[in-house]
From Swiss-Prot:
The encoding gene: Mak
SMART domains with a match to the protein in the record: S_TKc
Ranges annotated as spanning the membrane: none
Residues annotated as catalytic: 125 (proton acceptor)
Name of the protein described by the UniProt record: Serine/threonine-protein kinase MAK
Species this chain originates from: Rattus norvegicus
PTM summary: Autophosphorylated. Phosphorylated on serine and threonine residues.
Description of how the protein assembles with itself and partners: Interacts with RP1. Interacts with AR and CDK20. Found in a complex containing MAK, AR and NCOA3. Interacts with FZR1 (via WD repeats).
GO term, biological process aspect, one: intracellular signal transduction
Length: 622
């Protein structure tokens, strides 16, 4: 290790930490992965999956393992250095990618994946963080810590890949999955490249399946019988959902892109295309030169000369806490000052002007050599700098597109993303100021974003926009499917609204009282349970409820509750019977009459000379 100088830490994961280093001989920048566990022999080292897989893989779109060093029982992997990962590349942009850029990124990902599968491995952890970039022009697959050989014998472990990119057969605990799980993950990544939002942002494994069903619809038993067997074995039933056209969720994607994503995101792994088959899809047959360009293949030499890393600063990752197995995962981010969200600016999708793709020809695609031009010693003049974290991943529910329109008007939409998955203290204090413990939020107030985890941007999706079309969008769809609405107590909803439908504007209507009525005002009560629970009543009028200090319990018979009189006798107070009683059959209930019979006791027996007259009380002779 004395041949390398470590400069700063790039990341820290479950199995090891990643450092940025420089070769003392050539000055070349490298990424050094230091394993946490100790290795006492070379045989132990060579049995690692990462070593076994990477030493066999040499491809322009697969990260290069330069050497393995064992020193003082510590193991070090020396990798080529890459500027950033795909997640950081998306996060740091304020404009969506044009489709030509997405096509080139997807082509490189599928090229690398096809090479991995061809050599008998599948990755098992495909996600944007494990796709390393030198800008959008060069993408490489990294982190083979979970890779398996295709010929290895199942059962495999059930926990693989990050949840948002996990295939349904893995979510249903299949033990015989294979390379199609990588194709599913690539389909999810492709959708995210168009929108900068995860397509299936589940908060748990079960919620992940719900999110998939909400987009793809409930699978039919005839379409995926193995899936129903897996579901029944773990006592799971698929939720009944109607599929959404991906064009609604990804309006800036061409029809060929939608078709390719639909094929890769098939419930049945046997029906998904392989990576090689996906490369032959018409989506890639547009006459565009795909693959890394020559000067980006040599961009690392530019970094060696121009990139002077700053002093180490603590990175501020604002994403969900996850293991960081990525070997080159995250350049050290520098703390960013709080700033307002910048709306995403859409780039006109190129498919509107591009010529229709020519018919599929066998000879057209068999030009892999042209896709990987020779290395030319040209050095770009633009310096490369590391960019810190600016915000968390953007979510569904913030963008409303006009159906049938292009992305030109995306600049008018509210595309700001929350900078944290946790609620900010400012937002929480603001909510406390605007809400009192005795009332619902006012109709015009925004609902505070204190939901946990993935629902952090739901309140932004609830804002009405009269200028935009009410076409079925991801915002409206997820809102309809939500099991609860923020700021609304479901118990009070069932109490007041009865069987009425609660929609996204529930807190704007008159179902929810804005303030309590005055003490001692006319109180209307209805019988909430005519058959039993004689003492249970619920507030029915608009005047609110009665505080507990105005109530008093009398006796144990029937467990009645009476209102304490406010300056008048009990005879002046009666229960008002309004329309709420009309819906119950049987005789009417007069609580005054019945309760008075219960409360009235026999007159006390007069005492004799100040003592109780037991004979008068119990009978007998004096």
């Amino acid at each position: 290790m004395n041949r390398y100088t470590t400069m700063r830490q790039l990341g820290d994961g479950t199995y090891g930490s990643v450092l940025m280093g420089k070769s003392n001989e050539s000055g070349e920048l490298v990424a050094i992965k230091r394993m946490k566990r100790k290795f006492y022999s070379w045989d132990e080292c060579m049995n690692l999956r990462e070593v076994k897989s990477l030493k066999k893989l040499n491809h322009a779109n697969v990260i290069k393992l330069k050497e393995v060093i064992r020193e003082n029982d510590h193991l070090y992997f020396i990798f080529e250095y890459m500027k950033e990962n795909l997640y950081q590349l998306m996060k740091d942009r304020n404009k969506l990618f044009p489709e030509s850029v997405i096509r080139n990124i997807m082509y490189q990902i599928l090229q690398g994946l096809a090479f991995i599968h061809k050599h008998g491995f599948f990755h098992r952890d495909m996600k944007p963080e494990n796709l390393l970039c030198m800008g959008p022009e060069l993408v490489k697959i990294a982190d083979f810590g979970l890779a398996r050989e295709l010929r290895s014998q199942p059962p495999y472990t059930d926990y693989v890949s990050t949840r948002w990119y996990r295939a349904p057969e893995v979510l249903l605990r299949s033990s015989v999955y294979s390379s199609p799980i990588d194709v599913w993950a690539v389909g999810s990544i492709m959708a995210e490249l168009y929108t900068f939002r995860p397509l299936f942002p589940g908060t748990s494994e079960v919620d992940e399946i719900f999110k998939i069903c909400q987009v793809l619809g409930t699978p039919k038993k005839s379409d995926w019988p193995e899936g129903y067997q897996l579901a029944s074995s773990m006592n799971f039933r698929f939720p009944q959902c109607i599929p959404i056209n991906l064009k609604t969720l990804i309006p800036n994607a061409s029809s060929e892109a939608i078709q390719l994503m639909t094929e890769m995101l098939n419930w049945d792994p046997k029906k998904r295309p392989t990576a090689s088959q996906a490369l032959k899809h018409p989506y890639f047959q547009v006459g565009q030169v795909l693959g890394p360009s020559a000067h980006h293949l040599d961009a690392k030499q530019t970094l060696h000369k121009q990139l002077q890393p700053p002093e180490p600063k603590p990175s501020s990752s604002e994403r969900d806490p996850k293991p960081l197995p990525n070997i080159l995962d995250q350049p050290a981010g520098q703390p960013q000052p709080k700033q307002g969200h910048q709306p995403l600016q859409a780039i006109q999708p190129p498919q509107n002007t591009v010529v229709q793709p020519p018919p599929k020809q066998q000879g057209h695609h068999k030009q892999p050599q042209t896709m990987f031009p020779s290395i030319v010693k040209t050095i770009p003049t633009n310096p490369v700098s590391t960019v810190g974290h600016k915000g968390a991943r953007r979510r569904w529910g913030q963008t409303v597109f006009k159906s049938g329109d292009s992305c030109d008007n995306i600049e008018d939409c509210d595309l700001g993303a929350s900078h944290s998955k946790k609620p900010s203290m400012d937002a929480f204090k603001e909510k406390k100021k605007k809400e009192s413990p005795f009332r619902f939020p006012e109709a015009g107030l925004p609902v505070s974003n204190h939901l946990k985890g993935e629902n952090r941007n739901l309140h932004a999706s609830l804002k009405s926009d009269t200028n935009l079309s009410t076409a079925s969008t991801a915002k409206q769809y997820y809102l309809k499917q939500s099991r609860y609405l923020p700021g609304v107590n479901p118990k009070n909803v069932s109490l007041v609204a009865g069987g009425k439908d609660i929609n996204s504007h529930s807190w704007n209507n008159q179902l929810f009282p804005k303030s309590l009525g005055s003490m001692g005002a006319d109180l209307a009560f209805k019988r909430s349970n005519a058959a039993g629970n004689l003492g249970s009543y619920s507030a029915y009028s608009q005047t609110g409820c009665v505080p507990s200090f105005l109530k008093k319990e009398v006796g144990s018979a029937g467990q009645r509750i009476h209102l304490a009189p406010l300056g008048a006798s009990a005879a002046d107070y009666t229960w008002s019977t309004k329309t709420g009683q009309g819906q119950f059959s049987g005789r009417t209930y007069n609580p005054t009459a019945k309760n008075l019979n219960i409360v009235n006791r026999t007159q006390p027996v007069p005492s004799v000379h100040g003592r109780t007259d037991w004979v008068a009380k119990y009978g007998g002779h004096r």
